[in-house]
A protein has these predicted regions:
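Short alpha-helical DNA-recognition segment
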Residues: 22-41
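A short, Lys/Arg-rich alpha-helix, primarily the initiator
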Residues: 1-23, 70
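Short, basic-rich loop-to-helix N-cap that marks the start of a DNA-contacting helix
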Residues: 46-59
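Residue-level detection of the helix-turn-helix DNA-binding "recognition helix"
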Residues: 33, 44, 73
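The alpha-helix within a helix-turn-helix
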Residues: 18, 29, 58
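Short, charged recognition helix plus adjacent turn
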Residues: 59, 67-97
Length: 97
């Protein structure tokens, strides 16, 4: 069975936090002190989690900023591998010892 690609952190936020709590994007934005557009773009995969947003989410949900940024980094790396991984392997060669 193939590994599933990592989910965008906004999808995780929407499915694992907002929906179970019955919380709207607007309510979360107000609780975090950020524009609603930031949360909307995030949960629709159109925006990345920044360190500022990670700190706010961590404080609100009782998690860590590293949790949120780690998810974003994993997602970003997988996207980069899909876009440019083969080209990099073909053109960048390991340094000889």
């Amino acid at each position: 069975m193939a590994d599933l690609p990592p989910a965008h952190p906004g999808e995780v936020l929407r499915e694992d936090s907002l929906r179970p709590l019955g919380m709207s994007q607007d309510a979360l934005a107000k609780a975090l002190g950020v524009p609603e557009m930031r949360i909307s773009e995030l949960v629709h995969g159109k925006r990345a989690i920044t360190p500022d947003t990670a700190l706010r989410l961590a404080r609100y949900f009782g998690t860590s900023a590293e949790f949120w940024l780690g998810m974003q980094m994993t997602f970003d790396l997988e996207q980069a591998r899909e876009r440019t991984g083969a080209a990099i392997e073909a053109t960048v060669h390991p340094r000889a010892a």
